[in-house]
């Protein structure tokens, strides 16, 4: 068990919509959590990736790190540019290595690019929500895709 209960992994995920379909990616078998499952793009907030960025003027803080991380992760994992990032929900789970992970879930629209898989993903699909049952998707993610679909259709 983690010796410091204050420590969590913080991750951000993005449900990418394009023409009424949603991007899912298949994780490699090397992943610690949910190897070989389908997911949406995203990744961890990593200190060394933002601490060299310019600080916000007159503060000692970095702003928009979550959205900037999401843009970076979607580019790295899927080769896509996105726009219109909006908050959806959040959740916490305990990984198989006993480290708690806080996941911030967002949705966005495809802006440009064709899918080009990064090193941690082995396949992709653009799906309608009702097609999700045909894939072994990480629990909860299909529910989030359905939530986004309802939001965007209203």
Map each language-model feature to its residues:
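Residue-level preference for beta-strand/loop junctions
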Residues: 8, 66, 100-102
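A cytosolic small-molecule/anion-sensing beta-strand core signal
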Residues: 18
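Conserved Nudix-box catalytic region and its N-terminal flanking loop in Nudix hydrolases
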Residues: 21-72
């Amino acid at each position: 068990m983690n010796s410091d209960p204050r420590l969590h992994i913080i991750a951000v995920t993005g449900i990418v919509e394009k023409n009424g379909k949603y991007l899912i990616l298949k994780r490699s078998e090397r992943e610690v959590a949910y190897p070989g499952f389908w997911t949406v793009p995203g990744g961890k907030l990593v200190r060394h990736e933002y601490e060299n960025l310019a600080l916000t003027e007159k503060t000692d803080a970095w702003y928009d790190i979550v959205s900037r991380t999401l843009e970076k992760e979607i580019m790295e994992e899927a080769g896509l540019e996105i726009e219109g990032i909006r908050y959806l929900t959040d959740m916490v789970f305990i990984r198989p290595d006993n480290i708690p992970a806080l996941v911030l879930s967002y949705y966005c629209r495809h802006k440009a690019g064709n899918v080009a898989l990064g090193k941690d993903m082995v396949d992709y699909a653009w799906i309608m929500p009702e097609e999700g049952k045909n894939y072994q998707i990480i629990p909860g993610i299909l529910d989030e895709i359905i939530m986004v679909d309802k939001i965007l259709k209203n």
